[in-house]
Amino acid sequence: MEHNPKSQLKLLVTHGKEQGYLTYAEVNDHLPEEIIDSEQIDDIIQMINDMGIQVVEEAPDADDLILNEINTDTDEDAVEAATQVLSSVESELGRTTDPVRMYMREMGTVELLTREGEIDIAKRIEEGINQVQSSVSEYPEAITYLLEQYDRIKTGQIRLSDIITGFVDPNAEEIFSHSTSAIHIGSEILDNITNDSNENEDENEDENEDEDENSIDPELANEKFRELRKQYTNTSNTIKNKNRNHQDSLLEIYNLSEIFKQFRLVPKQFDHLVNNMRNMMNRVRKQERKIMKLCIEECKIPKKIFLKIFSGKETDQNWFKKEQSSNQSWSKKLEEIKEKVFSSMKKLKQIEKETGLTIEQVKDINKRMSIGEAKAKRAKKEMVEANLRLVISIAKKYTNRGLQFLDLIQEGNIGLMKAVDKFEYRRGYKFSTYATWWIRQAITRSIADQARTIRIPVHMIETINKLNRISRQMLQEIGREPTPEELSEKMLIPEDKIRKVLKIAKEPISMETPIGDDDDSHLGDFIEDTTLELPLDSATSESLRSATHDVLSGLTAREAKVLRMRFGIDMNTDHTLEEVGKQFDVTRERIRQIEAKALRKLRHPSRSEVLRSFLDD
């Protein structure tokens, strides 16, 4: 018998069709070993029954078989039925509740990319981003905002790397020297990542952690911004003197777009410009929805008719007046909503005034921007899905460091997505070469942030790792553990900071850690509670108290009370001679005499011997 599960089940169904029945033993023998759940087995048996094949405990009589032969299906029906069962069983075999297996199976359905495939996807990402930037460049406020940000650099308020990460040369050809460029970029990224680990982990800085301000030529940036400002001025003047739809204006807008696309904006700045445009579009839609709701719901204008008369005339009141003068059923009701509709139109005109664009142009820009975003997003998704295996291979090396394997995969995926955003195919190296560093950095950063019970900043983790590395090196050189003084001299770090780092590097231990082979004792049971009195001190105090009571009982009641009050025995505090005198209604001198007499009695060897032993303690 074949061991293929499909062949076994097909043979089982065919056999059942021929003899008209199957026994539970036959079904059990032909089921794949992976199916052990009772519910899955019941579902398969039910499907076999639905095909007209009885599943019984034992083989039926010959008379029953003759009756069943009347309802036996054709061979084609048997094949079709077998196919249904096979597909069902395949789904059962594929079903799993293990998230790692589900992730691996789904990841395996995506084919690996070739070098040409990577370039193709990278070009699609670039095309999508260029389309977005081209659309945003037609929004005057976007150019104004970027130029204002550059002016802030001159005053020292921000850095150049806070605005742009570089420039794109549209005429640059792809570099095919894989060996040199790959080595160069690997060391470059490693240097950037190493430098980043010593910086503050502020979210805004983290967005630009790979950017080196020295890599942006200030003179080139100044030239590019001057060119952008000049073209923006020419475009504005042309649009002002001529219509925006004039051929000269369209040419100037195109030239402005081509210059603007050369700027590689920081993600934060790019998102700001896109969100500004999107917010403007949301304001337009809000007013349009108000007008549509008034006309359709309150005046009962059919939706198709409303869209026909309203589209392209959002700020034109003539369409509304024309509908008022028409003899339609809704004409009279329009008077009731006139003020509200005109108020919304006024707000739309205000948007046109702010942007210098018509509502139709705002919609067109937003549409092209959304298409570009979707194109880039789809391409990025393809690039990420095709490189998920790379994350798995790297994450395996960081297991047993405090994070679950799935958490490592997810953190690595975040690094992979960042690598997709920053990948430059024109440099000539493969994407995996570039992405490896980002994935590794994301995983190590997450381990530093989340693996410890008490979180330690990443820059301190780097210092600890460096200290451990030098400690191992010195251990091999001098044959013993180095002292903090020696580490301070070697690392050129103050000794007090070395001691602080060594203290921080200690791992916390749970108070519930079991001690010994038995589980009845824990670490917390062996830690001294400094807030409570030690058993020995408690026993000594109790013995002293008892001995003092016995000694005082040998004095008169008056003498004993005077000593108790003067020395605070069994009282909250001691008392002065005057306070004790008031208590007994005598002078201070008399109390002093009583006290002296009582102490002389206690110094007698018969009484003092009992208390003298406590002085030794």
Curated annotation (Swiss-Prot):
Compartment(s): Cytoplasm
Residue range(s) of DNA binding per entry: 577-596
Compositional bias per record (Acidic residues), positions renumbered to this chain: 198-216
Keywords: Cytoplasm, DNA-binding, Sigma factor, Transcription, Transcription regulation
GO MF annotations in UniProt: DNA binding; sigma factor activity
Superkingdom of origin organism: Bacteria
Residue ranges of the region described as Sigma-70 factor domain-4: 551-604
Region (Disordered): 192-222
UniProt-annotated stretches for the region Sigma-70 factor domain-2: 383-453
Motif (Interaction with polymerase core subunit RpoC): 407-410
Gene Ontology biological process terms from the UniProt entry: DNA-templated transcription initiation
Chief localisation class: cytoplasm
CDD domains reported for this sequence: Sigma70_r4 (cd06171)
Chain segments carrying region Sigma-70 factor domain-3: 462-538
Gene3D superfamilies given in the database record: RNA Polymerase Primary Sigma Factor, Sigma-70 factor, region 1.1, Winged helix-like DNA-binding domain superfamily/Winged helix DNA-binding domain
GO cellular component, one term: cytoplasm
The protein's assembly and partners: Interacts transiently with the RNA polymerase catalytic core.
Protein family: Belongs to the sigma-70 factor family. RpoD/SigA subfamily.
Function text: Sigma factors are initiation factors that promote the attachment of RNA polymerase to specific initiation sites and are then released. This sigma factor is the primary sigma factor during exponential growth.
Name of the molecule in the record: RNA polymerase sigma factor RpoD
Organism this protein belongs to: Buchnera aphidicola subsp. Schizaphis graminum (strain Sg)
